[in-house]
């Protein structure tokens, strides 16, 4: 039961981290493109 609760907490957290990483990568890509 506790494992399932941890899993239901972990999945949205991974999604949030994943979207944050994508935002940072796209931001860095735009910065690099504007510098060039």
UniProtKB/Swiss-Prot annotation:
The chain crosses the membrane at residues 10-30. Its main location: plastid. The keyword Thylakoid applies. GO terms for cellular component: chloroplast thylakoid membrane; photosystem I. The keyword Membrane applies. It is found in: Plastid, Chloroplast thylakoid membrane. SUPFAM superfamilies: Subunit VIII of photosystem I reaction centre, PsaI (SSF81540). Keywords: Chloroplast, Membrane, Photosynthesis, Photosystem I, Plastid, Thylakoid, Transmembrane, Transmembrane helix. It comes from the Eukaryota. It holds the Pfam family PSI_8. It is a single-pass membrane protein. One of its GO terms (biological process) is photosynthesis. May help in the organization of the PsaL subunit. HAMAP family: PSI_PsaI. PANTHER family: PHOTOSYSTEM I REACTION CENTER SUBUNIT VIII (PTHR35775:SF2), PTHR35775. Belongs to the PsaI family. This is Photosystem I reaction center subunit VIII. It comes from Welwitschia mirabilis. The gene is psaI.
């Amino acid at each position: 039961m506790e494992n399932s609760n941890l899993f239901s907490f972990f999945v949205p957290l991974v999604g949030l981290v994943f979207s944050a990483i994508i935002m940072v990568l796209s931001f860095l890509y735009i910065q690099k493109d504007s510098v060039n």
